[in-house]
């Protein structure tokens, strides 16, 4: 999108935020992530990056239904080193688009071992002076995608056009979320994991192939060493459902995010049970 000046961009962002009932900061963050994603799609590395995580979920269900502040990707065809990733992102930042935004790499660091996927975290800045937005991109490698990544058509926030990017298929997105919920059990402190499973299945469940989801979950648990959840899920879900701590965390989450306010913790637990029963029975 071409704007006359930063103030006009802020006005567009403010209007979109009001329309979507989310904060202007979230819209600005997602707009800048979209600008980066388009650069990836136009770079020589288009077929090396595979989109996953919250930004993909937001694209699937809608920004007004799920917002995120960072970009999660997996990369193929490269050895994951600080030097390689810095070179790749420096080249991506140099891709010129008529959107008035300039990107710079601020830093490269390792993702903590305690996170879902060990990998590399890239800190960037998106600049449209005086606007400066810090961005984070997490890059992993060797992820288990079942059966394979797909070509995803990404609709832009303000322009009536799309970009094409490689992404996780729906079944792999759901499989990873289900594994996270079940393996972490009551130690999970992220209500958004429950929300993501619920909203993905509510809005896109009819498109989900149960046999593929079953296989994706099997392969994900094999990779993460959590195969016991496939048989123990009824007991795990009972423990989760009865957890006062998780219920309170959910209630706080649903108060903070307008899109979750009409969904109860019971709803999310019932959705997870429904999916697991459908693919495991």
Question: Where would I find each of the regions flagged by the language model?
Answer:
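Structured mid-to-C-terminal alpha-helical surface segments
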Residues: 1-49, 59-67, 71-281
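Catalytic metal-binding/acid-base residues of hydrolase active sites
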Residues: 56
């Amino acid at each position: 999108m071409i704007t006359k000046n930063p103030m006009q961009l802020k006005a567009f962002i403010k209007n979109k935020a009001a329309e979507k009932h989310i904060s202007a900061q979230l819209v600005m963050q997602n707009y800048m992530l979209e600008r980066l994603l388009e650069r990836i799609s136009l770079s020589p590395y288009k077929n090396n990056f595979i989109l996953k995580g919250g930004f993909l979920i937001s694209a699937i269900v809608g920004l007004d239904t799920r917002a995120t502040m960072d970009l999660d990707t997996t990369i193929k065809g490269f050895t994951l080193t600080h030097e390689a990733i810095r070179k790749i992102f420096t080249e991506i930042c140099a891709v010129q688009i008529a959107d008035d935004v300039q990107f710079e790499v601020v830093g490269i660091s390792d993702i903590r071992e305690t996170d879902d996927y060990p990998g590399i975290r890239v800190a960037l800045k998106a600049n449209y002076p005086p606007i400066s937005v810090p961005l984070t991109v997490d890059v992993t490698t060797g992820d288990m995608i079942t059966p394979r990544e797909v070509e995803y058509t990404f609709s832009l926030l303000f322009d009536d056009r799309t970009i094409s990017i490689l992404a996780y298929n729906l079944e792999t997105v759901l499989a990873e979320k289900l594994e996270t919920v079940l393996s972490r059990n009551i130690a999970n402190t992220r209500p958004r994991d429950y929300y993501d499973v619920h909203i993905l299945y509510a809005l896109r469940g009819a498109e989900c192939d149960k046999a593929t989801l079953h296989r994706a979950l099997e392969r994900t648990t094999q990779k993460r060493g959590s195969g016991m959840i496939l048989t123990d899920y009824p007991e795990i879900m009972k423990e989760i459902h009865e957890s006062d701590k998780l219920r309170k965390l959910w209630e706080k989450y649903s108060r903070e995010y307008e899109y979750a306010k009409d969904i109860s913790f019971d709803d999310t637990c019932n959705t997870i049970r429904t999916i697991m029963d459908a693919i495991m029975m």
